[in-house]
């Protein structure tokens, strides 16, 4: 039971990390692309 709970927690944490990572990457990508656009144009 406890082992099962630990595995569930790890899975939830992994999902949360993936979500934050993807949103951070998307934000970073839009920010850098707009910055490059400002630099070049």
UniProtKB/Swiss-Prot annotation:
Q: Which Pfam families match?
A: Trp_leader2
InterPro entries given in the database record = Trp_leader2
Keyword list, A-Z: Amino-acid biosynthesis, Aromatic amino acid biosynthesis, Leader peptide, Tryptophan biosynthesis
Q: Which GO terms describe its biological process?
A: L-tryptophan biosynthetic process
| Physiological role | This protein is involved in control of the biosynthesis of tryptophan.
Q: Name its species.
A: Vibrio parahaemolyticus serotype O3:K6 (strain RIMD 2210633)
Q: What is this protein called?
A: trp operon leader peptide
